[in-house]
């Protein structure tokens, strides 16, 4: 009886023994692909990005001084999904992509300041107080950063609503989390952060208040320039750095369309000639002229279109539209790296992993697992064994 039981146990052991190596192989393949697609691919992509070189010596009469360089990252249109239109697979996939990309960029590139150019959230324009708190907590987890790294945010139309949806409650709710500062100065560099949604120009309360704040910032910047030239019209007070500011906003300055935009992350060719609507796709011509006149910026960075574009306003003021940071809006998201001094700057673009490449790798993994399983159970000849059999047949001829 004992011999029969032992023999029965041996017979059952062989199938288990046969299945165990297959299971281990399948687990190993899945683990390796997950590790690469969800972690290592971000290091592989961002490791290829380097801070652009910028001239760091400024001539002051006969003396040359070395200027400090600020390393700044610019990204836009993260569009964290909300409870109404968002569904959990989309949230999980796209938010994990942005979190891994951002955390990898922080670790590899070590920026000093990060600017996000609006549309942080997808449903801030209508989210309930409870949903808003949940969205903010997710944002703070995804875009967590060391205390020595500054994170600055400007409002977009999806954060506080388009002009006709915007109200004081939504603006104050946003500014309570992300600050209401309009001017940020560091290392002798001035950044003006504009609530471009409130530049409709129709005299609404929020619009008037926003314009008054921007005029005050413009006055302070101009006073610093004049006092540096020996003028005393502005009276006593702390001086701002006298360098021309960098303008940061969500809406681009006025342009007719993306017809003159080019590059792999520009708008698709069939969309480039579509005319833009003022105060919807871009700022109005009037608001754009005001900003250029008030601040005389040396550089403008904006978001909103989800695509890249470089234009020059008046033939001298460059504006760069920053593509979306999320796979939800682009197959090839990216961000801008800037090496900036008080008198000069250089920008470069860092591309994140392409979503279609990741999907192709996963599809390839599924196909490989199917072939491996069929081969293991003898339902499909192993390519290696098939090759050996072919060689044997040739030798016997």
Curated annotation (Swiss-Prot):
UniProt keyword list: ER-Golgi transport, GPI-anchor biosynthesis, Hydrolase, Manganese, Membrane, Metal-binding, Transmembrane, Transmembrane helix, Transport
Placement of sequence motif Di-lysine motif: 393-397
SUPFAM superfamilies linked to this entry: Metallo-dependent phosphatases (SSF56300)
Binding site for a divalent metal cation 1: 119, 157, 250, 304
UniProt superkingdom: Eukaryota
Cystine bridges: none
Subcellular location(s) per record: Endoplasmic reticulum-Golgi intermediate compartment membrane
GO molecular function: GPI-mannose ethanolamine phosphate phosphodiesterase activity; manganese ion binding
Similarity annotation: Belongs to the metallophosphoesterase superfamily. MPPE1 family.
Protein name, per record: Metallophosphoesterase 1
Species assigned in the record: Pongo abelii (Sumatran orangutan)
């Amino acid at each position: 009886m004992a011999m029969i039981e032992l023999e029965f146990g041996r017979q059952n052991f062989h199938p288990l023994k046969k299945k165990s190596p297959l299971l281990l192989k399948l687990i190993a393949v899945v683990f390796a692909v997950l590790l690469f697609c969800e972690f290592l691919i971000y290091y592989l992509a961002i490791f290829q990005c380097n801070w652009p070189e910028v001239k760091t010596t400024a001539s002051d009469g006969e003396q040359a001084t070395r200027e400090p360089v600020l390393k700044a990252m610019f990204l836009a249109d993260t569009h964290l999904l909300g409870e109404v239109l968002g569904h959990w697979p989309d949230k999980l996939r796209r938010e994990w992509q942005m979190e891994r990309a951002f955390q990898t960029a922080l670790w590899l590139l070590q920026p000093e300041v990060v600017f996000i150019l609006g549309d942080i959230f997808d449903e801030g324009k209508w989210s309930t107080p409870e949903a808003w708190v949940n969205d903010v907590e997710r944002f703070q987890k995804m875009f967590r950063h060391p205390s020595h790294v500054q994170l600055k945010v400007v409002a977009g139309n999806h954060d506080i609503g388009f002009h006709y949806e915007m109200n004081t409650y939504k603006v104050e709710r946003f500014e309570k989390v992300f600050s209401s500062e309009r001017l940020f100065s560091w290392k002798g560099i001035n950044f003006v952060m504009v609530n471009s949604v409130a530049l409709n120009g129709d005299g609404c309360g929020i619009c008037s208040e926003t314009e008054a704040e921007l005029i005050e910032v413009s006055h302070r910047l101009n006073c610093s320039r004049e006092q540096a030239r020996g003028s005393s019209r502005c009276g006593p007070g702390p001086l701002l750095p006298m360098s021309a500011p960098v303008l940061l906003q969500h809406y681009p300055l006025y342009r007719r369309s993306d017809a003159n935009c080019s590059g792999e992350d520009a708008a698709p060719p069939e969309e480039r000639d579509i005319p833009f609507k003022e105060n919807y796709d871009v700022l109005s011509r009037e608001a754009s002229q005001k900003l250029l006149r008030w601040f005389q910026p040396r550089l403008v960075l904006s978001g909103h279109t989800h695509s890249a574009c470089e234009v020059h306003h008046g033939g001298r003021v460059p504006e760069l539209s920053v593509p979306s940071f999320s796979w939800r809006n682009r197959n090839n998201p990216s961000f801008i790296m800037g090496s900036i001094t008080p008198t000069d700057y250089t920008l470069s673009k860092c591309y994140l992993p392409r979503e279609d490449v990741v999907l192709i790798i996963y599809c390839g993994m599924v196909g490989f697992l199917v072939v491996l399983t069929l081969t293991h159970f003898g339902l499909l000849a192993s390519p290696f064994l098939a090759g050996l059999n072919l060689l044997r047949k040739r030798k016997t001829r």
